[in-house]
Amino acid sequence: MIDRETSGRALQQIPYGLYIVGSLNGGVPATIVANWVTQVSFSPPWVAIAVEAGSRMKEYIAASGFFSVNILPSGGRDMAKAFLKGPEAEGGTIGGKKFEGAKNGTPFLAGASASFECRVVQALDAPDHRIFIGEVVDAVVRREGKDVLTLRETGWRYKK
């Protein structure tokens, strides 16, 4: 059996970005902060995200069939902090931040360096997360070539 403390420290060495993942709760945009996001295919372009098993977001994504990923720029800690409690849309903003609806309504945040919307093509359960794989169906780039916000930059930790 592997030592969980040692394996946890080893896994913390993976460079994790911080992203705002969005979906729709009965047509209302909702968001969470996520850091387990990766591209898994070039053609077609597919992305995988992991959502905590206890998060309502996994139900929103499953019901709507879509999710968005908003890539935050380096220095965007305060922006990420606004989404830690998983806010929903209110008067054209989420967590006080402006957004626009993507092709299928998921939120694209105005302050993100880039945003993309995915149609769910597969989902599977890991022991403590639900993994969604989605095909990119809409995208916008606002600031190309900028460094992205990382978990390490914020000083935050994500562990159980």
Q: Where are the model-predicted features located?
A:
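Basic, polyanion-binding surface patches
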Residues: M1-K160
